[in-house]
Amino acid sequence: MQAEQMRQEIYQALVDAKGQDIKVLDVRKVTDFTDYMIIASGTSSRHVQTLADKICVRMKELGLMPIGREGEAVGDWVLIDFGDVVAHLMRPQVRDLYNLEKLWGDGERVEATAK
């Protein structure tokens, strides 16, 4: 699956699961370990875990399994690595603290739309 299609499927899964403040960054010019980063907030640790589950279920339906899935024990910040796309799912307070959008600010913002 192409990175752009993977990005769209993950974005749609987040929209369907009511992810908040979803941002998509094209980081191909900034790093070589991934093409896109998707950052989204959940209202609680449980919601963050639900967002992660929804992404993994959707991608499994498409025949893709994550390379890695980290942070579920606490649920404040869950990272799911699909190689070409990395999803960061966080509670708003954690997102404010780490401010990944600023850290990866050299990446280009991608305007994604839900189906």
Predicted regions and their residues:
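Short hydrophobic/aromatic beta-strand micro-patches
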Residues: 39-41
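Catalytic metal-binding acidic patch
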Residues: 35-37
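Active-site beta-strand termini and strand-to-loop segments that position acidic
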Residues: 80-82
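Polybasic/polar functional segments that serve as interface/processing modules
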Residues: 1-33, 45-78, 90-94, 100-115
